[in-house]
Amino acid sequence: MDLAAAAEPGAGSQHLEVRDEVAEKCQKLFLDFLEEFQSSDGEIKYLQLAEELIRPERNTLVVSFVDLEQFNQQLSTTIQEEFYRVYPYLCRALKTFVKDRKEIPLAKDFYVAFQDLPTRHKIRELTSSRIGLLTRISGQVVRTHPVHPELVSGTFLCLDCQTVIRDVEQQFKYTQPNICRNPVCANRRRFLLDTNKSRFVDFQKVRIQETQAELPRGSIPRSLEVILRAEAVESAQAGDKCDFTGTLIVVPDVSKLSTPGARAETNSRVSGVDGYETEGIRGLRALGVRDLSYRLVFLACCVAPTNPRFGGKELRDEEQTAESIKNQMTVKEWEKVFEMSQDKNLYHNLCTSLFPTIHGNDEVKRGVLLMLFGGVPKTTGEGTSLRGDINVCIVGDPSTAKSQFLKHVEEFSPRAVYTSGKASSAAGLTAAVVRDEESHEFVIEAGALMLADNGVCCIDEFDKMDVRDQVAIHEAMEQQTISITKAGVKATLNARTSILAAANPISGHYDRSKSLKQNINLSAPIMSRFDLFFILVDECNEVTDYAIARRIVDLHSRIEESIDRVYSLDDIRRYLLFARQFKPKISKESEDFIVEQYKHLRQRDGSGVTKSSWRITVRQLESMIRLSEAMARMHCCDEVQPKHVKEAFRLLNKSIIRVETPDVNLDQEEEIQMEVDEGAGGINGHADSPAPVNGINGYNEDINQESAPKASLRLGFSEYCRISNLIVLHLRKVEEEEDESALKRSELVNWYLKEIESEIDSEEELINKKRIIEKVIHRLTHYDHVLIELTQAGLKGSTEGSESYEEDPYLVVNPNYLLED
């Protein structure tokens, strides 16, 4: 830009004017390109775009480098190789082009931005050989600074002779004139900046980092500072993966000047008796001169999302409409989206296409798919936000493909962050306040949840996180904000992200006899914030093991052939983007159905037959609503239908019920009674009564046999539920058929034995089955309170046979009991 300053007319009549013929030729050719290049329909392509620049807020014209190559190959090559040198002349050509057609303010500057460069470079490929060349790089934005005004061209006033010195180019730091332009004035230091006549431009500094896909083996991600000017400011936010087009420049490292180790030495010399120096000056340090180091910075003129249409920031952009998305697609792409929306088997096909390498685990695939579609975020009249994002946690044994789900989602979703719970701190997950090296101001550096804003944050080893780190994400999981108050910075940041977490059980393997809460090391507040819990158990099943082994071997031997996708990932991304624009409303019918299902969950939570994995709260009701909305979105419906609620309830039901309950001990009451009798210790005199010594009567042997430990009668939980459901259904059927009806216990036992008559082969088995059904009825009556024994006062009429009635009471089903599906 110093050459451009020298080429400015009127830069000083006493100085020799240096003409850059190459740059001036580029200026003329670029002006010809703007005036002559036509689009496919025969119109001048950049005319209308240039006319929009007269608006006060516009000053940058975006030019496709492909168009430039088509127009003049030599011009495009010169611009690419001498970009820093010719850039001011290109901006002047644009100003001339606009001035010829519209009236513009004289002081307004115009800028050119190039996009669609054919090659993209990695951050670690930027060396000093690429300084000044037009380059395109990509990376993820990890830190953004506030927008500041930057002094581009200064106007100075000489304090000695009052001469005005215009257009002093700033070399990326505050630069004063070397000497006053007045020939009779020798001032070199005393100048005053006239801010009213100087030119400023918007300036923002961002830091980008290499993406994981670009990292060589065993390398740490490198970062680079990018300078954005004019319209490019605020076009990239923390977490965005963007392409930056511009040039590599060298700037003085001002931060090194203020470090303690670089202080100048001015008084190190020893003075003699008369005040003279005893030694001469040795080295530059003795003169107080510091070594000025330099660093590489990327000066960007254009910023674009890495995947501009169906990725980056726009996948979760709530402001777009279905019509605007349709306009972004080609006819073929839109036909594919429409075809997918009409697919009767869309739910299954999307799951298999998204996770083709994972065998089984269909429920987890469905839950993760609904998480990607998400619910509808809402704001109440008081301003309270209700989140629409769905949080999913996968708990399971080792080698059950938990991390594979997280990796698949990270690769598929354009804005996803993968992190490990053990290696992450609270600041790394939320946000950190750091001091800027140059301005020494505190700035906020985005953590994983901020980087995944409007995306998915995948957290592996979630149970290994420290408790204080888990507490830090409470707010982000429910309110979807991150509040920071530290180091004089008070801010509330957005973290509108879905969390997909994977956790291992406490003992390494899931204990089926314990509830979910007892199996994982998570607090109750964290657990209630997850919409879905999926439990993966590594079972020894011959059929399943063969299928999994067959799948893995196929993947290793025939990678391309074994991956069978109905839809490509790009098709799914386009369909996701389109479907997420729907804002389904809940119909009256669905509303009643949701309330009814929630009542079922609450009542079952308090019943004794089945215990839930954790407490059912209002958050589970909101989870059901979000899942129902995600189902409606997936089918591109404007209204939530009862079938959507039914599927949401089924998924929620899978995660709320524990995997397996321990066997039911039917002799529990007798064992407790025996313990009580043993503890009595002969108070009633039974233990002290003498027994026959010789055992002539035979009682002593029987007593010894009975006192031997007896195996308790146990029944599998599933079998216990099956028998109880049979009993309940039969009793209700009898109640419906007859008005005044109730079965006696003996009648119920006889009915059950008759039902299973074909399963009984011997008298001993009959006695055993009869004992089991009697114990089950006793437990259902006195422990689970599913059945009720009618008292004598509750029956109409008869007062006879009260003794027999107490031994063989009438049984009815508790009216509050809900039969399990």
Swiss-Prot record:
Cysteine disulfide partners in this protein: none
UniProt-annotated binding residues for ATP: H359, S399, T400, A401, K402, S403, N504
Enzyme Commission number(s) of this protein: 3.6.4.12
UniProt-reported outcome of changing C158Y: Found in patients with microcephaly, developmental delay, typical facial characteristics, endocrine disorders, feeding difficulties and urogenital anomalies; uncertain significance; impairs cell proliferation and ciliogenesis
Catalytic class of the enzyme: hydrolase
Motif (Arginine finger): 528-531
A Pfam family reported for this protein in Swiss-Prot or TrEMBL: MCM6_C
Any one GO molecular function term: identical protein binding
Post-translational modification: O-glycosylated (O-GlcNAcylated), in a cell cycle-dependent manner.
Ranges where the MCM domain occurs: 346-553
CDD domains named among the record's database cross-references: MCM6
UniProt modified residues of type N-acetylmethionine: M1
Entry-annotated residues carrying Phosphoserine: S13, S219, S271, S689, S762
Positions of modified residues (Phosphothreonine): T278, T791
One Gene Ontology cellular component: cytosol
Alphabetized UniProt keyword annotations: Acetylation, ATP-binding, Cell cycle, Chromosome, DNA replication, DNA-binding, Glycoprotein, Helicase, Hydrolase, Nucleotide-binding, Nucleus, Phosphoprotein
Role this protein plays: Acts as a component of the MCM2-7 complex (MCM complex) which is the replicative helicase essential for 'once per cell cycle' DNA replication initiation and elongation in eukaryotic cells. Core component of CDC45-MCM-GINS (CMG) helicase, the molecular machine that unwinds template DNA during replication, and around which the replisome is built.
Record's subunit section: Component of the MCM2-7 complex. The complex forms a toroidal hexameric ring with the proposed subunit order MCM2-MCM6-MCM4-MCM7-MCM3-MCM5. Component of the CMG helicase complex, a hexameric ring of related MCM2-7 subunits stabilized by CDC45 and the tetrameric GINS complex. May interact with MCM10. Interacts with TIPIN. Interacts with CDT1. Interacts with MCMBP. Interacts with DDI2.
Protein family (similarity comment): Belongs to the MCM family.
Protein name: DNA replication licensing factor MCM6
Organism field: Homo sapiens
